[in-house]
Amino acid sequence: MEYEFRRNSLTGTFLASFSMDHEVLGQWFSEELGPELAKIQQVLDIIKEIQSGKRDSWRLIGKDFSLDLDEEQARIYANALGFEQDYELEEAMSLYDAESEAYCGLEDLEEALLSWYKFVQKGL
């Protein structure tokens, strides 16, 4: 899982980009976590609790994206994926979920979060 962090020099916004199949992580980092160091630290602390066996799982529901953690992996997904459709879409018109959902190992997420924390902290 590759990623890159940038800061928009005009707006000061922190931006994260992740490799293919993990694009939604970039949106989650940029839009849900942003420069909130306390929120980033909270997720890091929860990961440690799960790794140590103090907790089995955890969910953080955000405005547009949510995070599910368990002993094995992390799932980041667009909240819109949870809505049931009342109608059938043609195959060519089906919703593309690959850019709206991603899975990664807890260690990979922890490493990326630590990097994001340091990047944001340096930029504030």
Curated annotation (Swiss-Prot):
Classification of source organism: Bacteria, Pseudomonadati, Pseudomonadota, Gammaproteobacteria, Alteromonadales
InterPro entries: UPF0231
Name listed for the protein in its UniProt record: UPF0231 protein SO_3983
Entry superkingdom: Bacteria
Family, per entry: Belongs to the UPF0231 family.
One Pfam family matching this protein: UPF0231
